[in-house]
UniProtKB/Swiss-Prot annotation:
Membrane found in the keyword field: yes
Main location: mitochondrion
Sequence segments annotated as region (Required for hexamers formation and DNA helicase activity): 122-373
Protein's recorded name: Twinkle mtDNA helicase
Coiled coil location: 454-482
Listed GO biological process terms: DNA replication; mitochondrial DNA replication; mitochondrial transcription; protein hexamerization
Gene: Twnk
Organism: Mus musculus (Mouse)
UniProt note: domains: N-terminus enhances protein stability and hexamer formation, which is important for DNA binding, and is required for DNA helicase activity and, ultimately, for mtDNA replisome processivity.
Length: 685
């Protein structure tokens, strides 16, 4: 083993290639000189502008066969002999046939991981190693980076200060901790097997992250409990930060002979399941937020994987998404319900966890033959109406009253006049969802990512940070922890490159909301047709198909066609043919009256809502200091009838909901009219 040192660069440990197919081409591109990076830099999505096509499973198989490399076809990875392991190391292990096949190659991305040496790299790195030529030059592949010295010291300091619950000197303190975390029925033996400790100073449970195959400590997760009016809320802190914390809690207890595993979203649930069923259990490091592809090799050995992630529809949707990564044919899902709560709650309620596991539904079926396969899904939506409506905005309550929420698999088209603040509004719109755990990918083709990030950081802090630079690091650290990613594209790009990047983001980062700003700037290089309208229709159709196939919400910003300044924009004002509005599930229009009357109000109009048909208009107020939109404080007035284009008064909504009307009747939120004057408000209001 040898070390590579660079001035002003972090220490990198590399492992020389061993075995029959050793390459000799120099270092991988990941070690090329470049600017020093921060310790916890959020990875930018790779730009696909370069002539590098995404690899397919067929291409990987053909490449391995062409170079005489044996491989085994797995569920989500291909297994091959590892060139990073000395043959004597393999002989020292148990002589199982699959033991030497410890190199896992992801079928979707081509990324590889050696389970024995922990060497990893991209598909291009692996190709360079196989095809390399040269005399005497040694090839190296980057090992998965361990924690830096500062992080390692902090991990050891906390771990050494933490003690097992049963060793607490005060029995009342131990009992209080058990009650606080719901562990009254979890035995000391279970806590001991999973090496769970308790940090008295922080009143937190401590869950360890051990290096696979050894007892080395790589990180920790601290779980604190805060009392709320509606129960206990758990607060998680990971060391290192969430983006690099890849701990499958319970992995050291898994043996090679295990063929079935139950996957949970919380460590507490894994404790309850293991104790009640005796089955192997694993807990995902970031719960229902994402399943990093780096963890897939550790799940390859299982023939059956049961997801029991939680008791709400969001957990159910996450389970279905994760099953697609792992091959749905081997996955089963525990449906949320009154008699099927979280595993820990089920244990505390005296329910039979093995019985609940037997009710798990297969994640894959060839076809729907009758209502029988759908009835439980329908019941779930009827029983959880608010959750079925999607994630609700915290900054735009009137948008919740109209759209009800942000749902996966939908296409939203957003338009507004030039200079009205479309990008500023849609950035806050997406940021609101991102702060609630909606993994978001931004494709900004008109303005740079630096400028966009500056706007979003200002909106996140709700203050101008240029006037408070001493607080920048604090807010930047909090902003960096958001599940937010940016495409590195700028200007005109082909739809194929953009879709490839979006699919990569969905697979690697579990992105469920993509923002494209905007369509006209992106489609400049589209050579599908000389007819610009036809090209736009094709692109809109591609985004529609992507949203449906990947269960990912796509928000598409489109400039309107040229209209007179004294006229309001309509759905027909969207540039191009009617295909954009036809394909869209939601159509949002930012109406800007200041272009006609001078400085004035802006309104957000929901002109299409496929979910339940409610449409309407509500006012916005722009705060220049925080770059945010908010509802004017004086808008707390009754709903008013407005006239349609024919001068007829729209009928009152039959739903009776404030701020909502069915598809054609629009409702405007405005001030109460004076009692001495008739109500003369119009839809432009």
């Amino acid at each position: 083993m040898w070390l590579l040192l660079r001035r002003a660069y972090p220490l990198r440990i590399l492992l020389p290639l061993r075995g029959e197919w050793v390459g000799r081409r120099g270092l991988p591109r990941s070690l090329a000189p470049g600017p020093p990076r921060r310790r916890y830099r959020k990875e930018a999505l790779p730009a696909l502008e370069m002539p590098v096509s995404p690899v397919t499973t067929t291409e990987i198989r053909q490449y391995l066969r062409a170079h005489g490399i044996p491989f085994q076809d797995g569920h989500s990875c291909l297994r091959a002999p590892s060139p990073f392991v000395v043959s004597s190391d393999i002989k020292n292990e148990k002589k199982d046939a699959p033991t030497s096949f410890c190199l896992f190659i992801d079928k979707t991305t081509g990324h590889f991981l050696c389970m024995t040496s922990l060497a990893e790299g991209s598909w291009e790195d692996l190709q360079a190693s196989v095809e390399g030529r040269g005399d005497g030059a040694k090839e190296g592949v980057l090992l998965r980076e361990g924690p830096e010295a500062e992080v390692r010291e902090e991990v050891l300091r906390i771990w050494n200060r933490a003690i097992p619950l049963w060793e607490l000197p005060d029995p009342e303190e131990a009992q209080l901790a058990r009650v606080m975390f719901g562990l009254t029925k979890v035995t000391d033996d279970t806590l001991r097997r999973f090496s769970v400790r308790y940090l008295r100073s922080a009143r937190s449970l401590v869950f360890p992250w051990f290096t696979p195959g050894s007892s080395g400590l790589r990180g920790l997760k601290l779980l604190g409990a805060e009392g709320q009016e509606n129960g206990v809320q758990y607060v998680e802190t990971t060391i290192p930060r969430p983006g690099v914390y890849h701990n499958l809690f319970g992995l050291p207890l898994i043996s090679r002979r295990d063929t079935e595993v139950v996957v949970t979203s919380r460590e507490l649930d894994s404790l309850a399941l293991s104790q009640s069923t005796g089955l192997p259990t694993l807990s995902l490091p970031r719960g229902t937020v994402c399943l990093p592809p780096a963890l897939l090799p550790y799940l390859e050995q299982f023939r059956r994987i049961v997801f029991w992630l939680g008791d709400d529809l969001r957990s159910w949707e996450a389970a279905k998404l994760f099953a697609r990564k792992l091959n749905p044919k081997r996955c089963s899902l525990v449906r949320p319900g009154n008699q099927q709560p979280r595993p820990l709650e089920a244990l505390n309620q005296g329910l039979s966890l093995p019985r609940i596991l037997r009710t798990a539904l297969p994640a894959w079926h060839k076809s729907i033959v009758s209502f029988r396969q759908l009835r439980e899904e329908v019941l779930g939506e009827l029983s959880n109406v608010e959750q079925a409506a999607g994630v609700r905005w915290s900054r735009f309550p009137d948008l919740n009253r109209l759209l009800k929420g942000h749902r996966k698999g939908e296409l939203t088209v957003f338009t507004g006049p030039t200079g009205s603040g479309k990008t500023t509004f849609i950035s806050e719109y997406a940021l609101d969802l991102c702060t609630q755990g909606v993994n978001t990918l931004w494709g900004s083709f008109e303005i740079s990512n630096v400028r966009l990030a500056r706007v979003m950081l200002t909106q996140f802090a709700v203050t101008r940070l240029e006037e408070q630079l001493d607080k920048y690091e604090e807010w930047a650290d909090r902003f960096e922890d958001l599940p937010l990613y940016f495409m590195t594209f700028h200007g005109q790009q082909s739809i194929r490159s953009v879709i490839d990047t979006m699919q990569h983001a969905v697979y690697v980062y579990d992105v469920c909301h993509v923002v494209i700003d905007n369509l006209q700037f992106m489609m400049g290089h589209e050579q599908l047709s000389s007819d610009r309208i036809a090209a736009q229709d094709y692109i809109v159709g591609a985004f529609r198909k992507f949203a449906t196939d990947n269960s990912c919400h796509v928000t598409l910003v489109i400039h309107p066609r040229k209209e007179d300044d004294d006229k309001e924009l309509q759905t027909a004002s969207i540039f191009g043919s009617a295909k954009a509005s036809q394909e869209a599930d939601n159509v949002l229009i930012l109406q800007d009256r200041k272009l006609v009357t001078g400085p004035g109000k802006r309104y957000l109009q929901v002109s299409k809502n496929r979910f339940d048909g409610d449409v309407g208009v509500f006012p916005l107020e722009f705060n220049k200091n925080s770059l945010t939109f908010s509802i004017p404080p004086k808008s707390k007035a009754r709903l008013k009838k407005i006239k349609d284009d024919n001068g007829l008064v729209a009928k009152k909504s039959s739903s009776g909901k404030k701020g909502a009307a069915h598809q054609n009747p629009e409702i405007c939120l405005g001030q109460d009219p004076s009692p001495a004057q008739p109500d003369t408000s119009k839809s432009s209001g």
